[in-house]
Amino acid sequence: MIFLKLIKSIVIGLGLVSAIQAAPASSIGSSASASSSSESSQATIPNDVTLGVKQIPNIFNDSAVDANAAAKGYDLVNVTNTPRGLTGILKLKEATNIYGYDFDYLNLTVEYQADTRLNVHIEPTDLSDVFVLPEHLVVKPLVEGDAQSYNFDNSDLVFEYSNTDFSFEVIRSSTKEVLFSTKGNPLVFSNQFIQFNSSLPKNHVITGLGESIHGLVNEPGSVKTLFANDVGDPIDGNIYGVHPVYLDQRYDTETTHAVYWRTSAIQEVLIGEESITWRALSGVIDLYFFSGPTPKDAIQQYVKEIGLPAFQPYWSLGYHQCRWGYDTIEKLSEVVENFKKFNIPLETIWSDIDYMDSYKDFTYDPHRFPLDEYRKFLDELHKNNQHYVPILDAAIYVPNPNNATDNEYQPFHYGNETDVFLKNPDGSLYIGAVWQVTLFSRFLSRKHSDMDKVIKDWYELTPFDGIWADMNEVSSFCVGSCGTGKYFENPAYPPFTVGSKATSYPVGFDVSNASEWKSIQSSISATAKTSSTSSVSSSSSTIDYMNTLAPGKGNINYPPYAIYNMQGDSDLATHAVSPNATHADGTVEYDIHNLYGYLQENATYHALLEVFPNKRPFMISRSTFPRAGKWTGHWGGDNTADWAYAYFSIPQAFSMGIAGLPFFGADVCGFNGNSDSELCSRWMQLGSFFPFYRNHNYLGAIDQEPYVWESVAEATRTSMAIRYLLLPYYYTLLHESHTTGLPILRAFSWQFPNDRSLSGVDNQFFVGDGLVVTPVLEPGVDKVKGVFPGAGKEEVYYDWYTQREVHFKDGKNETLDAPLGHIPLHIRGGNVLPTQEPGYTVAESRQNPFGLIVALDNDGKAQGSLYLDDGESLVVDSSLLVSFSVSDNTLSASPSGDYKADQPLANVTILGVGHKPKSVKFENANVDFTYKKSTVFVTGLDKYTKDGAFSKDFTITW
């Protein structure tokens, strides 16, 4: 949750010291304690310990040295050809020691790993004090085939170099275009600063380099800071995740390639008019080039190497409801009942930190969430085929040793006994404020059993269905080990008011003219409390505040090169653990800060496998890194209830698709601030087409469940009916993404990669290859503009609602009717979409009859597929894949696999049939149909498919 979200804990290195409102926790192995709503006097974390040291980012510092101008570079000597490439030694020409101490000698290794992949690896000859990212933490792409033999003529990529004033180029062999070139730019490689520059073509199109709130294209002038950061979704700032990969889409040659730097270092990337500059503050150079040649090819090649996305359970495609403020079991129950009352499908209800006792992980509040009522609620939820997901913040509370009941908090003792918590350089426990529940030191030391145990014990108490992993950048609300020697004052308040009332509203919201203003006002919950005036003093420590050069690892708290970190002072320790915090094997946070969330996700995923053997773990996490998609889905973080953030959710989804995190969604209707009926209506409909669909908001904001406003409820029911009808299509896309790495939401420029006019389109998107969504992203309008590539030429589009072909023109920005409650949706000709009659839950929907929507292209052809299994098994023993093809007025269905879907096929709708057929046959039997405006509606097929819609091959002819 937001960095405003509270100092939920005085933290222990890898654990959280949940601190806030109340007394001892009801935790695993502890007895119930006083209510967390207690009004007794409490200590407060002093504000001064939250303030970092003011840094001037180098990019804003006019007096900063330009490394590219000052550095002398290296010469390449001792080049040796290898079966897969070459090796050599880079010798420093002259030390300049601009932002660290230059390394005299570097090892160069070039490896042709596959026909479409090339690796360039540069590291110091002496690796003392150099962090090299271990392969067991983040997988390293390996050579395909025989490592001792390769036919270089087969490679799509060619490596060329110059010995004197070393530089290199990567060239596409088929077109001879230079994809990457450091010519004219010296390599800088020191203990705390690495820099290389590559030329780019003019009018380049660079995408990726997440995570930030930005449009699809990183235009010239963009600065991308890659440093995981707990901050509430600032536009153009570094936020939760780090993904050092970009796509370079070139329209002159109609090709796309990808470049990936495998590093966990703090990084900064500058996009110029004709160049890209990449910097890191530690580590080595480990570059991978993927040749594409299409955007989809390049994405798949990259994602395949970092790890294909997790296969999410079928139920995850249902609607999820959450908010910070469901603070009693009665409120949770009321929300679930209201969704049923208003006939709005609800699959999963979520809990934010409200359920915890004093905000301690793995606990429940015995007064607001009494265990018997809590379990009864969960039993009823599961009985109705619904699900529950609680939050798990990345921290373990440090109990007060002077309080016997408080000291019974077992998760702390588990971790302490196995020595998994972060340490200060002197070996003492690093104690911050709001830290991680998944113990990072444990990950590096391979100790997982305690994590498995606490999660399993937690599940035994309150049987959840998945985990929401938050605050795992990792976040700490104070600078340094501020809790050292102070945990005996726990629990303690944060240094700000928790849940203060939100006063902002979306652009276009007029209070005086808002017919629902009165009801909105009445729904505001006065939950803010005033914190105590007492304080917890910070621990004293000696810190080098200067960005000075230092030998060895260097000055890691304040490195000589200051990045632009989106915190008020740019201090690396602001809202984060200090860079000098030490992990189990001596690794410092400075080198692996960006990995924290990823390693938590890995451990949590495997702990969930202990809870749900051979079931697909469900997890949504905030901080991500390459390969995180193998373990988790992702949500867009603490956005704002405003139109701009509805728009930004689309390019953010594209960026996560590139990064291998296709199961993505934003907080629908907005997290921070107050939403209104118009924005929420539009956003609920937009969100219904994202893979992950959740409404969530801030404690102090007004209610924004879709049933709060009648207009939003109706709009939601309309779009949810479409989503649930298309669940088989979405599940098939989930499977495709899991097996191929393809994103689910797709940019127009990926679908039509040779049309430069589409390069920046990020206000529309494809769902798979078959659906085009054109949302309204501004207030006070009833029309929206959209483009439809190839329309009127080689492409055909059909209106979802009328099922008629729309006569658009290629390259024209078409005006679409979009009254409130209506989201324009079109089907691209040439696709077959599997459907299933929607029910209230995913489980109900899966029991209903199937259908097919066939959208013919200009040649009367179409194709598609359907994937089915039990929807939850990690290792799928039984599955069904149905291939659909249409040509010559015949639809053919060819199933393969042994999974039995008992539900019949009820109907088939065929779009784009020019003349009314004389008859329609299922196999050789005449079947009922109607014809209207180029659409054939075939019904009554259930009597021919009683044994299951896809139990055998069939044809339908017309």
From Swiss-Prot:
Cited PROSITE patterns: GLYCOSYL_HYDROL_F31_1, GLYCOSYL_HYDROL_F31_2
EC number assigned by the record: 3.2.1.3
Annotated glycan sites: 61, 78, 107, 197, 403, 416, 513, 580, 602, 813, 907
Signal peptide from the UniProt entry: 1-22
Protein family: Belongs to the glycosyl hydrolase 31 family.
Active site: 470, 473, 638
UniProt superkingdom: Eukaryota
Keyword Signal found: yes
GO terms (BP aspect): polysaccharide catabolic process
Coiled-coil parts of chain: none
Summary of the function given for this chain in its UniProt record: This glucoamylase has a specificity toward both alpha-1,4 and alpha-1,6 linkages.
Protein name: Glucoamylase 1
Sample GO molecular function, one term: glucan 1,4-alpha-glucosidase activity
Keyword tags: Carbohydrate metabolism, Glycoprotein, Glycosidase, Hydrolase, Polysaccharide degradation, Signal
Pfam families: Glyco_hydro_31_2nd, Glyco_hydro_31_3rd
Gene: GAM1
Top EC group: hydrolase
Catalytic activity: Hydrolysis of terminal (1->4)-linked alpha-D-glucose residues successively from non-reducing ends of the chains with release of beta-D-glucose
Species in which this protein is naturally found: Schwanniomyces occidentalis (Yeast)
